[in-house]
């Protein structure tokens, strides 16, 4: 099941149109092809009438991918609590720390590539087709690679006030519901 699910996720990633992201200077000196699913901070988006966090617009642009990624992490670690999923294509991150994360993160890389190990404080980890738990507050980066590499990072953001885990929420464009479909918050 997990192998089939990984292939399904990879096929969906291959068929996903990735935007150019210029707002991640802590991870790369160059624009990246990436986006965020789940709940996000709204930085510099004036049209949101003062709202500071809520559902990512990418949840509704890529609903099938969003659902598949939630199934993927659930198939590996059913009890893992997270709010946000960073989705990267061919992104070679420079050494950085994730200052806006709380607790451990899980990362996996999918695709047809060589190289691209995750390095955490000088220790290398092969994350191709396998999840790795790590502390984003430790310096980490990606080794050079060749080919198409998709990395998925599942983490909890330091929202104030805290938000419940995405693992137990249903998110639409305008609201967040709990697992019993009870309204938690409208946007």
Question: Where is each model-derived feature located?
Answer:
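Fe(II)/2-oxoglutarate oxygenase catalytic core
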Residues: 1-131, 137-187
